[in-house]
């Protein structure tokens, strides 16, 4: 069994499962702090488990994988807005909506207003900060951990694309070419940022 073979921490897997219970209901994400915890225990946990499988137990990477999970998770939250909004499920924290003078119903209306665009720009800015911090921390991390961070190459590419297309309708799904995905991963796997030292 994979858990035993790689000595994966069962408590981390349990938290991952427990946090995903939130996905089953239409309760809104209450605060940015709650989103931080959710993404840390879901997306961040996957990066931590991948690192554990690749190099074994590594000390002092929790901060690194937490930021990696936040960068990937925030960008995924934005990309999933069309699907989640159609299901009346909201992962954008209520306190962020309130700070921009928005309510849930305005998001569910699926109209790309300037206020919604500003709120999403703030989220993209946070994703950018977490991604930049992760890549900075990865430079000092043990070299074997870097391949486990390879999905961040897609986060970086998608974030650049989103930052360039600020006038795109956030409620229309943005399709990602499979060939472009493979090309991005192939190129990143050969770059110093993601290669073992």
For each of these PLM feature ranges, what is it?
Residues 2-21, 35-48, 58-73, 78, ...:
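Catalytic cores of Mg2+-dependent Asp-rich isoprenoid enzymes
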Residues 23-26:
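Short membrane-interface loop/juxtamembrane segments of multi-pass integral membrane proteins
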Residues 29:
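Glycine/charged-rich beta-loop-alpha catalytic/anionic-binding loops adjacent to active sites
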Residues 49-53:
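Alpha-helical transmembrane segments of multipass membrane proteins
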């Amino acid at each position: 069994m994979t858990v035993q073979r790689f000595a994966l921490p069962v408590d981390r897997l349990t938290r991952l499962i427990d946090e995903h219970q939130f996905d089953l209901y239409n309760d809104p994400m209450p605060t940015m702090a709650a989103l931080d915890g959710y993404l840390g225990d879901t997306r961040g946990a996957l990066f931590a488990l991948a690192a554990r499988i690749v190099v074994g137990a590594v000390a002092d990477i929790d901060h690194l994988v937490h930021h990696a999970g936040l960068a990937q998770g925030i960008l995924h939250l934005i990309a999933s807005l069309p699907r989640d909004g159609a299901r009346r499920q909201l992962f954008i924290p209520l306190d962020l909506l309130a700070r921009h003078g928005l309510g849930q119903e305005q998001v569910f209306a699926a109209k790309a207003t300037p206020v919604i665009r500003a709120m999403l720009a703030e989220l993209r800015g946070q994703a950018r900060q977490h991604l930049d911090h992760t890549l900075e921390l990865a430079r000092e991390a043990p070299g074997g951990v870097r391949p486990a961070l390879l999905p961040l190459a897609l986060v970086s590419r998608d974030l650049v694309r989103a930052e360039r297309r600020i006038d795109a309708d956030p409620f229309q799904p943005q399709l990602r070419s499979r060939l472009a995905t493979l090309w991005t991963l192939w190129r990143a796997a050969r770059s110093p940022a993601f290669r073992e030292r």
